[in-house]
Amino acid sequence: MGFSSIANPEAFENDPTLAWGFYGHRLLSYRNTQPHQGFNLLKKLGERFTLGSFIFTSNVDGQFQKAGFDPLRIYECHGSIHTLQCAKPDDCCRNTWLAIDEQPVIDIDACELTSALPKCLYCGGLARPNILMFDDWFWQARPYQQQKKRLEQWLTQVEAPLVIEIGAGVAIPTVRHFSERVANNGERL
């Protein structure tokens, strides 16, 4: 099974146990991962600048926060796996909430959730990670709009922004496009 076939809202509709097996495993993995030394190097570099640094990331793992970066200086353009939303927001609500109480139990061999499916706090239906997936018309981006607004405000104050792009691929070019916009003529988001 390819990444795009499980990393989409339809997977939660067709096989929620498998979808949550995949995302539950990722959630647990990210919770247990300690940020590597590169995060500390970036943090120290950012502290050398008068206006500090601002993180633009497509990673959904929360590692920048875990590494001690200011959460008010992070824009997670694809959301966070540590936040949940209703799988059917048009039928329920567009609220999000932290996944801190979720403790998924996963059968690693089958990649299936063996514990109870996470439920929407508002309607009791299926919950899903609040991350932008492939073919995703239901992602609730509202929590990240405030992050984006803070980034835009910060960029207006920086005369010559230094962009350090790490690990940005070609398959999903969101980070590369952002870097190019900042580098070319100081364009904003």
Predicted regions and their residues:
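Conserved catalytic alpha/beta core of Sir2/sirtuin-type deacylases, generalized to analogous enzyme cores
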Residues: 1-189
